[in-house]
């Protein structure tokens, strides 16, 4: 759907961000090969979206993503910011940093790999400009990923929706758009090792959805390796649920019941003379079972305690290494509603 602004007055962009209304945040990590196609797609968006800026956040990428962006942005016709973080803090921290520094009044977030079609950004701003929603999320109708990846993703999100947060769409969420009010509420949640998608739905507000088909990756390789996926899964669970501790509690209660029952049975057997020699194997099995359960339980509790400790340190969620701005550019004549009409 083509984007249509709600007002028509001349607007000038200045380096301090005055005049920017629509900000697109793009986290960048190992996307050097995607940069040419990405910049070309953004040029097309810039022609369709008024008062538009793009905020690139290079999340400690080990390749030449930052250099490639700097070279390409020298010829960009839209307003832009290029932020480099001092190391890899994770995509969620990069997105937050981009939201914090964006100059607009409405915001959208997409990935740099172009697996989400860029026209989603126009859809997000169209819905936000209507004023009936505060948050718009992209919902995958289908995804062109390897079968194993699709199966594991479907299984994970189904379990997450069933056990932890039912509001999240069945296929999960990777991209979203929001207005100023929602952005301010989101930025107030200064939690380390949290789950950004969970925060979006935990906050509430008026939500809308835009359905799309996730495209196959044609350039480069995904940086979401097994270790990152595992950490992402742990953060998504421990940040929004006490389910692991509840399961541990029920396992402990069940183990206690079994132990008490076994005690009465063994005492009755011993008094009746059925047990002549104490068995080595049952004792060892019991010790190993309950010992491993104890260690497992301590690990679960430790995950929660560690997250509490991390949040008490008050360290910044990310550190900026460099921050560059695009030149002052004349944007399209269309303008958003006056500031007084925005949240």
What are these regions (language model features)?
Residues 2-21, 195-343:
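Hydrophobic helical membrane-anchoring modules
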Residues 42, 98, 113, 136, ...:
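Residue-level signature of catalytic and energy-coupling elements of molecular machines
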Residues 83-87, 91-101, 118-194, 215-234:
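Acceptor/aglycone-binding surface of glycosyltransferases and processive sugar-polymer synthases
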Residues 29-33, 115, 119, 187, ...:
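Residues in soluble alpha-helical coiled-coils and helical-bundle/repeat scaffolds
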């Amino acid at each position: 759907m083509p984007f249509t602004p709600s007002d028509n007055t001349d607007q000038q962009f200045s380096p301090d961000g005055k005049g920017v209304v629509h900000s697109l945040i793009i986290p960048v990590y190992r996307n050097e090969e995607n940069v040419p196609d990405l910049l070309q797609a953004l040029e097309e968006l810039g022609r369709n979206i008024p008062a538009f800026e793009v905020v690139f956040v290079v999340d400690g990428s080990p390749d030449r993503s930052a250099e490639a962006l700097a070279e390409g942005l020298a010829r960009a016709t839209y307003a832009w910011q290029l932020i480099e973080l001092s190391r890899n803090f994770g995509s969620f921290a990069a997105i937050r940093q981009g939201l914090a520094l964006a100059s607009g009044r409405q915001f959208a977030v997409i990935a740099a790999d172009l697996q989400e079609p860029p026209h989603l950004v126009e859809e997000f701003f169209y819905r936000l400009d209507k004023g009936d929603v505060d948050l718009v999320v992209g919902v995958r109708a289908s995804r062109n990923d390897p079968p194993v990846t699709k199966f594991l993703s479907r299984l994970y999100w189904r379990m997450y929706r069933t056990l932890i947060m039912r509001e999240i769409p069945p296929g999960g969420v990777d991209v979203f758009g929001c207005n100023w009010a929602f952005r301010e509420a989101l930025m107030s949640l200064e939690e380390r090792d949290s789950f950004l998608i969970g925060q979006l739905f935990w906050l509430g507000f008026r939500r809308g959805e835009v359905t799309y088909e996730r495209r196959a990756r044609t350039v480069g390789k995904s940086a979401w390796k097994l270790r990152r996926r595992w950490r992402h899964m742990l953060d998504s669970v421990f940040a929004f649920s006490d389910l692991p501790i509840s399961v541990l509690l029920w396992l402990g209660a069940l183990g206690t019941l079994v132990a008490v029952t076994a005690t009465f049975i063994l005492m009755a057997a011993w008094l009746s003379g059925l047990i002549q020699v104490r068995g080595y194997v049952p004792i060892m099995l019991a010790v190993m079972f309950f010992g491993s359960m104890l260690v497992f339980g301590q690990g679960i509790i430790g995950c929660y305690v560690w997250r509490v400790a991390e949040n008490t340190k008050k360290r910044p969620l990310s550190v900026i290494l460099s921050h560059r701005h695009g030149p002052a550019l004349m944007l399209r004549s269309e303008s958003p509603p006056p500031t007084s009409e925005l949240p």
